[in-house]
Amino acid sequence: MKQTDLGLDMSTRRTRKQILLDEMEHVMPWGELLALIAPHAPVAKTGRPPFNLAMMLRIHCLQQWFGLSDLAAEEALFEAGFYRAFVGISGTQRIPDRVSILRFRHLLEEHDLSPKILEVINAKLAAHGLLLKTGTVVDATLIATPSSTKNKNGERDPEMHQTKKGNQWHFGMKAHIGVDADSGLVHTVIGTAANVNDVTQGHALLHGEEKIVFADAGYQGAPKRDEATGVDWQIAMRPGKRKQQKLTPWGALMEQAEKLKAGVRAKVEHPFRVIKRQFGHSKVRYRGLAKNTAQLMTLFALSNIWMARAVLLQRAKA
């Protein structure tokens, strides 16, 4: 007889996924998020009762953290006991199928709850003094579509477009974000087609309370736009002009100033790294800008919690 037959598990090492879920259990504002979603949840008058709302919210978060499709999330719940424990499935409880998981996502999309999820999470972070709002860093990143995303007529998503970056063409969308200049936490998210110029979205990435904005050379001309006045724009010098400046007496001083600005701008890259590398969101998952932008808002909201989790855990233990 094996130890597993007796119900004994001699393994004590926790995986990175288990550690992450344990951390998220303690730092996520579960109560506030449920209060946000509950008024929109369907109520069954007859037939089988709907799945527990808290369970479905946790499954939705699992999908974002580990890059799971609806089908993959269903299968993961069957395969991994620690997933079931995290979402609250025990004993003989039913496991939500892919259709139920899909319907919950559609519920969030239908009632435009993803921006509000970002607001709820940021309110928690602001309460801990992690969002100062005195400065903003803006930037955008390309998120390509998978090469096989065509409909039955062989046509690509009409809401996505192609653009050239360097010597390479990309087909997909852009995620534009505004982050807190001090903490690097995201406060604003906008999704557009890939061919939209960054500078056209710069003003929309500001929350209105900042006094200074940092941006790369792609935002040249932003201070001259009518909708972007009233703040101090610190925009990177174009590479060609920066190279010429090195030949002038002020070159060394200007180079130091550019390096200081680059150090602040670097914080905007951290959320991009989290959603693309940590959460695995390197390609768009759905068709259409609305659905993909909604997912991006949830991803960046969860990336804020992920980036601030060490501070939140420390304060929770204090």
Where are these regions (language model features)?
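Amphipathic, well-packed alpha-helical segments that form the structural scaffold of globular domains
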Residues: 34-42, 122, 272, 276
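Polybasic low-complexity intrinsically disordered regions
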Residues: 2-5, 28, 52-53, 57, ...
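Structural motif
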Residues: 46-53, 167, 286-296
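Active-site-adjacent structural elements in folded domains
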Residues: 40-46, 88, 161-163
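Helix-centered, glycine/charged polyanion-binding patches within enzymatic domains
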Residues: 3-7, 11, 211-212, 217-290, ...
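A positively charged, amphipathic N-terminal helix/segment that binds anionic biomolecules
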Residues: 21-35, 40-46, 51-71
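Phosphate-backbone recognition surface of nucleic-acid-processing proteins
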Residues: 83-102, 235, 241-250
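Charged, often Cys/His-bearing segments associated with DNA-binding zinc-finger transcription factors
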Residues: 1-31, 38-39, 314-317
